[in-house]
A protein has these predicted regions:
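N-terminal secretory signal peptides that target proteins for export/translocation
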Residues: 1-10
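Intrinsic low-complexity/disordered segments
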Residues: 7, 29-31
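Bacterial N-terminal signal peptides
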Residues: 12-28
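Low-complexity, acidic/polar, glycine-enriched regions of mature
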Residues: 31-205
């Protein structure tokens, strides 16, 4: 992941500074700029079909920052904030699968693949987008491609995205007893309404 950020230039410094603050990892924050959007209440869910029982969880504490002028984005997901229907399933998820005390956050940094075209047409209509970036989960980082939409609505940047991941790719160990009864791929959905960042200096305590 370090190499990817380095190759993206200094623009990532603006993105990751606010993201760290939103995720509760940094102190005072100063942000300048136009066309930049943030949220700390993004929504993410995942679903995996299973013969034994479908696995589904939701999280409304996603921190995200999007630089609309460059097409770069980043988000951070607190793993322990995923909510399940069953408490026991949530405990297994955190303790046995995700090891959330050791790996408390999942992160993504990416770039719109067709940024120039999207940014030109975005003010007038919802745009289908493709994002390529680095997803870090359970301490493992992989390059992923994500499909979604962008829309400017009521002074907010509305983001929808969807992609699939394979837990095995991120060294998430599923017990042998249930391995054959759980889908090899997990469907992920993301929904965020990001507020514009004021062009003046923003400082948070």
């Amino acid at each position: 992941m370090t190499g990817f950020l380095r190759s993206s230039g200094h623009a990532w410094l603006w993105l990751l500074g606010p993201l760290l603050w939103l995720g509760g990892l940094a102190g005072p924050l100063a942000a300048h700029g136009q066309g930049k959007y943030m949220t700390k209440a993004g929504y993410i869910s995942f679903f995996s079909a299973s013969i034994m029982e479908d696995i589904e969880a939701k999280n409304t504490k996603v921190a995200a920052v999007f630089d609309l002028s460059t097409g770069q984005l980043a988000f951070s997901v607190p793993v322990r904030e995923f909510q399940f229907k069953r408490t026991l399933m949530q405990e297994h998820f955190n303790e046995n699968y995700m090891e959330s005390e050791k790996y408390p956050k999942a992160t993504f940094t990416g770039q719109l693949t067709n940024a120039a075209q999207v940014l030109k047409l975005l003010p007038s209509a919802t745009q289908n987008v493709e994002v390529e970036g680095q997803l870090t989960l359970h301490g493992v980082t992989h390059k992923v491609a994500v499909s979604g939409t962008l829309q400017l609505r009521d002074n907010q940047l509305v983001i929808f995205a969807y992609f699939n991941i394979a837990p095995a790719d991120y060294a998430i160990d599923v017990p042998l007893l249930v391995r054959e009864h759980i889908a090899k791929s997990v469907s992920v959905r993301v929904s965020m309404a990001c507020d514009a960042v004021a062009q003046t200096l923003v400082s948070q305590p």
